[in-house]
Amino acid sequence: NIGIEYLIFKYRLNIYLEYFQKIEHNLLVIPGAKITDIKNVYSHSQALSQCSNFIKSNGFVAHVRADTAGSAEMVSKNNDIRNAAIASALSSETYNLEILKKNIEDDRGNLTRFLIMGKKISQPEFGNKKYITSFLFKLKSKPAALYQSLGGFAINGVNLTKLQSYPEKNSFDSYFFLCDLDGHIEDKKVQKSLEELGLHCEDFHVLGVFEADKIREK
């Protein structure tokens, strides 16, 4: 399971686009199988976690697999009514399985964010749209460095939507931070905020400027 942070740190990939997808999990079974036949359920660890209430309430034994589609394929090939997969509706069509229960996820409002990434840097022109600027930075080693570095965003009224820390390789006291903000890098408020941040940084790298997914407006 390769995380976005791995791709960014190892290959210095840039972000071109974001897309949010509503997560909908279904219980897929061999055609004709009933809920009382099911003993084992297979899926990706995240899908199993997102459907934990359903799994527990039915007394199923959860088995972790590499991905949801692969779980559906395995259940189809084994052709055992005691086995089920948690996967998408598309997987049911692909592997000739029946959807026994739809939308079994614990949180019906769960979303997953997908990013389109690549080597070259490309960004939309600054206009009358909602943008996200994503960047990576490493702070100078000093007390209260993170607190001081973020002050410029508050002063200039720039909203941070994401801030995640990652330890530098073979270090317990040096961290990189992955950050998203609302705004285009050519916006003066954003520029002033990043200039202030830069005073506290050893390393700074813009990962991408892209239009915000429309779901952020809801």
List where the protein language model places each region.
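Domain-level signature for soluble enzymes in the chorismate/prephenate branch of the shikimate pathway
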Residues: 1-218
